[in-house]
Amino acid sequence: MIAELWSRAILKRIRARNEASSRLATEVPDQEGRNINRVLLREARFEDFPEISAMNSRLGQGPDSLENWHRLWRDNPAIRSFNAPSRIGWLLEDSGRIVGFLGSIPLQYEFRGAPLVAAATCRFAVEPQYRAFSHLLVMAFFRQKEIQLFIDSSATPAAGKIMAAAKAQVLPQKTYESILFWVLNPRRYSAYALRKMGLTGTAVWLGRVLGQLVLQAASLFWNRRPPASTASLEVRNEPLSSLGDRFEQFVDTISHRQTQLLARRSSEILLWHFEAPQNRRPVSLFTCYRNGQMSGYLVLRFYEESQEGLKRSVVADLLVQDDDSTIVAALLRAALDQAQKAGADILEVVGFPMKIRECLFRWRPFSRSLPANPFYFKAREKKLHEALQQEVAWYACPYDGDSTLWP
């Protein structure tokens, strides 16, 4: 109720302003009622990159480059071939200094055979003393009249509250916040788990040896790997640049049969999506063939930077004909082998519909939960929004939104 009242108040305030203006000024009174700041909202431009990048770095966002901005907002297939808007996003300024930013990446989607123009949030960051104005960026994002579907696939709990106040909804895919994972390096994972428990020094050194033995014993029942592919299936490790007609035929077949919302896939889009300038997170593409016909593929992304002492490989995309469990198993086996070869300590699977997850449950992965579901959506038209409130309407995974777009 409070969130709804807040949302209405925000909307009323914004609509009262002149929407034709590209700048919106808001004054902040101090405790004695004096105006101490004048915050302006405007669209971001390419020349704003250095200051926005510096601010994002200060606030804990990852590295970026002007070349990557050109990739996202000039070379984007949704802009070049889908007539999507090339709007970078919005920023907050105080006395000419940038104090907040929210990007908007145009993307192509399909739902029940109809194409959709979507936009994904990215790099949402506001300096602490200006976070009372964060909602201005979010409301500007949702005011894009050319956009049919709005997505935030990587919302923090704080950002999620702002999205909810703007009447965006949490993804109805109930298991999205539950991450499945396989331990590939038991000793390093044991040390990580012990540090999370607050142990240090000798206790960690001794505990990781015991933990390794426990995890190796547990692998008889948990953390299992599928067997090698059957004779009828062939799994290949192929470069993204090699995809051609066979891939287009495969995704077209899936698209025509699919009743779920699906981010557009093509050889051009996958190459654009995963091959960012100065990419620190290399990908491996595995394709699966049955009787010479492509029947599925998996994209594995390796995160070279460690997260709390762990190196991760993540299943960034997975599409399989008829959700065939034998194809899922063959691709999972290839992904696990490649992740271990690359030096990953764990392999993670985030999202995907229950039919795919049920195929993965056969191999008894471990699981952990995020503090909250990070995926929010909002459709411009009521009919589409209502349809997307059903879990069966989604095929959400890290390929959606901006989750795997950054270098």
Model-derived features: positions:
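Conserved N-terminal entry element of GNAT/NAT acetyltransferase domains
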Residues: I2-W6, I10-E47, V214-D245
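Secondary-structure boundary elements
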Residues: S95-G96, Q144-K145, K341
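A conserved beta-strand-loop-helix scaffold within acyl/acetyltransferase catalytic domains
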Residues: V39-F124, L233-V320
